[in-house]
UniProtKB/Swiss-Prot annotation:
GO terms for molecular function: 4-hydroxy-tetrahydrodipicolinate reductase; NAD binding; NADP binding; oxidoreductase activity, acting on CH or CH2 groups, NAD or NADP as acceptor. It holds the Pfam family DapB_C. The active site is at H147 (proton donor/acceptor), K151 (proton donor). This is 4-hydroxy-tetrahydrodipicolinate reductase. GO terms for biological process: diaminopimelate biosynthetic process; lysine biosynthetic process via diaminopimelate. It comes from the Bacteria. Pathway: Amino-acid biosynthesis; L-lysine biosynthesis via DAP pathway; (S)-tetrahydrodipicolinate from L-aspartate: step 4/4. The gene is dapB. GO terms for cellular component: cytosol. The keyword Acyltransferase does not apply. Its main location: cytoplasm. InterPro entries: DapB_C, DapB_N, DapB_N_CS, DHDPR_bac, NAD(P)-bd_dom_sf. Belongs to the DapB family.
Length: 254
């Protein structure tokens, strides 16, 4: 399957190019979208990709787009994909309602998956969080996430996704149960998220389930950002023969 990388100058984009250099389980890099000059030397790649700032040409040259960009960039990409539908794997966070609506329109025509975190470990972490939230009905739930000091969004998209998983398991009102700034007593049907920023931490997420006399903590730590690139490529392989739909990352585990 021919892969197009959108957001190639970003941290994950560069890792995607590195993973695709020799081909990844039959995936071939066919196009790279760049707004400015690309620093990557493509002479060592198994296939010479189209490197362009022409969004329509970029989309036409591939069968699946993997996107790790910015919200406005993804919005422009979706407009091009609605004209020329291709499979989409997106890890861009902080999206506006209008962008999500365009994504839903595209999902009527092709398979796509949008996730805040593409690591296989986080996929399993979500399932464990759901089970613990469901079974430990009396436990207070608190989430702590830690990232590098250059991360722009807080709480992280992954932390918000974990919150949604826990709230759904509990049957909480997802719009009102979230607490990111607490003063005074803790309300019973609430889930807190604390965001820490410092150094070069790739990503750490911990969920605490606090009971009387004991507590359980589930934790996931990313020690290398390559897990996000490899995870996205695995998602692309999984979507290849799927029907048109917006898939959830947990569906990969059946």
């Amino acid at each position: 399957m021919k892969i197009g990388v959108y957001g190639a100058s970003g941290r994950i984009g560069k890792l995607l190019l590195e993973e695709l250099k020799g081909g990844y389980k039959g995936l071939a890099l066919s196009s790279v979208f760049v707004r400015q000059k690309c620093e990557t030397d493509f002479s060592h790649f198994s296939h010479s990709p189209l490197v362009t700032n022409d969004l329509k040409a970029f989309v036409r040259a591939c069968e699946c787009v993997i996107d790790f960009s910015l919200p406005k960039g993804l919005d422009h990409l979706l407009e091009a994909l609605l004209e020329c539908p291709k499979i989409l794997v997106s890890g861009t966070t902080g999206l506006e309602k209008e962008t999500l609506e365009k994504m839903q329109q595209l999902a009527l025509r092709v398979p796509l998956l949008h996730a805040h975190n593409m690591s296989l470990g986080i996929m399993m972490f979500n399932q464990l969080a759901f089970l613990a939230s469901l079974k430990l009905k009396d436990a207070d739930i608190e989430i702590v996430e830690t990232h590098h000091n250059l991360k722009k969004d807080a709480p992280s998209g992954t932390a918000l996704s974990l919150y949604e998983t826990c709230a759904k398991a509990r049957g909480y009102d997802e719009k009102n149960a979230l607490t990111t700034h607490r003063e005074g007593l803790r309300s019973k049907e609430s889930i807190g998220i604390a965001a820490l920023r410092g150094g070069d931490v790739a990503g750490k997420h911990t969920i605490g389930f606090y009971l009387e006399g004991e507590y359980i903590e589930l934790s996931h730590t990313a020690t290398n950002r390559s897990i996000f690139a490899k995870g996205a490529l695995e998602v692309a392989l999984w979507l290849k023969d799927k029907a048109a739909k917006k898939y959830e990352i947990n569906e990969m585990f059946g």
